[in-house]
UniProtKB/Swiss-Prot annotation:
UniProt gene name: hemH
Keywords, sorted A to Z: Cytoplasm, Heme biosynthesis, Iron, Lyase, Metal-binding, Porphyrin biosynthesis
UniProt-annotated binding residues for Fe cation: H189, E293
Organism ancestry: Bacteria, Pseudomonadati, Pseudomonadota, Gammaproteobacteria, Pseudomonadales
Annotated catalysed reactions: heme b + 2 H(+) = protoporphyrin IX + Fe(2+)
Protein's UniProt name: Ferrochelatase
Functional description taken from the UniProt entry: Catalyzes the ferrous insertion into protoporphyrin IX.
Amino acid sequence: MTDHALLLVNLGSPASTSVADVRSYLNQFLMDPYVIDLPWPVRRLLVSLILIKRPEQSAHAYASIWWDEGSPLVVLSRRLQQQMTAQWTQGPVELAMRYGEPSIESVLTRLATQGIRNVTLAPLYPQFADSTVTTVIEEAKRVVRDKKLDVQFSILQPFYDQPEYLDALVASARPYVEQDYDHLLLSFHGLPERHLTKLDPTGQHCFKDADCCKNASAEVLKTCYRAQCFSVARDFAERMGLPEGKWSVAFQSRLGRAKWIEPYTEARLEALAQQGVKKLLVMCPAFVADCIETLEEIGDRGLEQFREAGGEELVLVPCLNDDPQWAKALNTLCERAPTAL
């Protein structure tokens, strides 16, 4: 064993389904300026208003999908960590969560006390967004700076277009996609439109026309979450040999009144049912592990909404989770992660 650790980082989860734990988790999550990018006083006021009712609602949702072992996201991430231990030969494999426990700070501090000087930081997000990738990187840098840790990072870059990831995604979904169904919906997590426009390096591309994501230049694509999502969908459909009209893309998990990227998953579920789709497959390629957004938002509420609109069956395709091919692909991606300056 060497002194080069691999640190897998996912979003996080409440410690339990209690309202108090959910409130604490939501407060930490929503107060992140990369998540709600408003001035602190406005963000504090908005989050305080959200926390009046949302914790109880979310606690009920978490309880409906909670496993005996704990949070599905944490359990599945632990299983992936175990898979990666057999793949990563350069040192220990650790898991941290951006919000909740185990925290990035606690894990990095422990690694440093063990003499670990090199860490490959792996945000487990295929597509780039400030609210996912950037906040993980900046939190890790903050810990090293504040704790004065002697740690050098290599950082896994967004891997939405990497063949290893796409091949693993296709292989894990193939048993479901090869079954009989009417339509495949690829539902990605949504973002406020302003999160994209503020990162547009040209200042003249995002949302200027209906095909902006399809026609994105390499410069724009590097930081455009929506364009990267459409890229994943197109590459997946091409690898699976899916014809036009058999699949579509939508964006879920809206929060607040700001304009979010479209089309919205809720509207798409209703429209597909009204168009005569009876059996619908849904994949959520923005997530590498099943979580409340997949299991509850799509698997439970999405199914109910689809049926109310006239659909009959909604099949949720599992995320990559601890799939062995995914673990092998992730190891390859992490091995070539560049060293941060």
